[in-house]
Amino acid sequence: IVAYLIDEKRLGGFHFNNKKYADDDLTVGSINPYELFLIYNELVAAEYDGMKLDVAYMIDQSHNIKQKIEEMLQSVENIQKAYAKALIVDRKFLKKYQLEGDIVSAEKILTDAFETDVMPIIYKAREELGVPLDPISSLRDSGYLEKIRKERV
C-alpha cells in the first residue's frame, strides 16, 4: 500500500501505533517491528530513487498502562531503529533481485537489514546531536517525572 501510494503521489502521512486485535494504540513497533521497517523501507527507497516526499508523521497512541512520556520515547526509538535499518538496505542488490524475480534473495536483503543491530548508529547520531544516549534513563534521572507527579497531586 505504501509503495502504491508513493507511486501515485497520494501518500499524505502516517499515524503510527501498533495493534494486536483492533486499533489498540500500542507502542509503535511493539507488536510487528518488521511491518514498521517495511514502511520505512518504502519511504527510503522512494527518496533513493529521487522522489521528493512530503509526508506527515504522527504518533497516535493511548498510553493507559505505561508511563506516557516513557512510552512515547520507546515509540520514537522504535521508529529510529526502523528508519536506520531501512537506510542500510543494499538497494543495488535489492533492485537486481527484484528485476530478476528472485524473491528469496530480495527478501534476504531485507531481512539482513532488519536483523542488523543499528543501535551503534543511533548512539552515534545521538552523540553527534548532543542528546542522551539512553533517553528513558535520562528522563528518569532528571527528576522531571517526580516533579510533574507532585504538581498534579
Feature annotation, model-predicted:
Residues 1-153:
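Histidine-acidic metal/acid-base catalytic patches
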